[in-house]
């Protein structure tokens, strides 16, 4: 459903405002949380739509609305606000719609793309084979990002995620960040010489 308002997408395209998509996004942010209401978030936002409003502005208004609803009686709005913030981060990093956020690109693709962007050091490829990067990817649990509170996720986005500070474009999600920090720290770790190896055995305990 559209009210005729034109919105500016992150990539610069102009499209008709899809109110249904906005409603679904807020509802998704509230899914599984007790004591929260998607309609309350939308009403609290008091969004004044105008031609040319950006999707980023709409996202920020909704995040602020959910944040303003956080109280001792309604603490779960901190997770609603965090999820709305996360949807925006995922949109930038995955380049996909929020509702397709479970279609995650593999770590290897993120590494190569961010090397091309100049935000990851290409030297990391000298220490890890593709198979090892794929194995690292298998350890990532993206749904862990849904456990952040709003304050916690905002701190990570503002201070720790790799991004272009001039445009605020973000290049990684928290789970990708954690994995890349670990991979970078242990890239030169002399596992064999220190004999710090864990080998699987068939011994019953």
Regions found by a protein language model. Give the residues of each.
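Extended catalytic cores of very large enzyme megasubunits
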Residues: 1-197, 203
